[in-house]
Amino acid sequence: MRWKKLLFWGSALLSVGADQLTKFWVTQNFELRRPPAQPDTWPLIQNVFHFTYVTNDGAAFSLFKDSPLLPWLSFLVCLGLIGLGLFGPRFPQWEQAGYGFLLGGAAGNGIDRIFLGEVIDFLDFRLIQFPVFNIADISINVGLACLIFATWQSSRKGSRKTPTP
């Protein structure tokens, strides 16, 4: 296999690896406390940024909570992105990175959903009262940002080729 999609596979492996390693670290160093108990937390900057061990059995921001289809949806998204990586065309660099980060993020949270029944979250920005999240969530957002940038970049290139009246 030629490495014509190295950025795709590299960003996918980097993001799923970082996600699973950080979640392993959290499970080894924090105690999972179920509500109504307060979660185990470690303030890096008091009332600004904490590591807080919580779980989420829904998707982003607890959407689709308790849905039995969510693990299968994660699996199908990963399967589609793997298929794109194996059989799809060679995309420009920003698209490769974008799809790779999406795959890594979907796989990271999908692994949790399939094997644990819930996703481990631990990044807690208290200053802005943002929901607790994880590296996989960051990877998904980075992937979307890369794809938006790729679309913007290609539309700029396309508009340069169009003659003006």
Swiss-Prot record:
What EC number(s) has UniProt assigned to this enzyme?
A: 3.4.23.36
Biological or metabolic pathway of the protein: Protein modification; lipoprotein biosynthesis (signal peptide cleavage)
Location (main, coarse): membrane
Report what the protein is called. Answer: Lipoprotein signal peptidase
List the subcellular locations: Cell inner membrane
NCBIfam families, A to Z: lspA
Gene Ontology molecular function: aspartic-type endopeptidase activity
Gene Ontology terms describing biological process: proteolysis
What does the record give as the active site?
A: 121, 137
Looking up InterPro entries in the UniProt record yields: Peptidase_A8 (IPR001872)
